[in-house]
Amino acid sequence: MERGNRKSRIGVVVSNKMTKTVVVKVERRVADPKYGKIVTKAEKYKAHDEDQACQIGDRVRIVETRPISKDKRWRVAETIEKAEA
């Protein structure tokens, strides 16, 4: 049973050294408030990867979930594109 709309993000896996956890870098393009120049801003999210299937460079979709640990509030929903080996 789904409760409301959950936030989702698409990003690239930058680290998978932790057990059942990956770090996903999500980039977004925003206009600078003063000058209007388009700049790229990035955020990193720790996400739960139950199957430990993600590799560095994979493009994944993460969705919001209940807090799993101090830093983890996201989980990997699907792998959109696998990294080239």
From Swiss-Prot:
SUPFAM superfamilies: Nucleic acid-binding proteins (SSF50249). Keywords: Ribonucleoprotein, Ribosomal protein, RNA-binding, rRNA-binding. Disulfide bonds: none annotated. One of its GO terms (biological process) is translation. It comes from the Bacteria. Belongs to the universal ribosomal protein uS17 family. Part of the 30S ribosomal subunit. This is Small ribosomal subunit protein uS17. It comes from Anaeromyxobacter dehalogenans (strain 2CP-C).
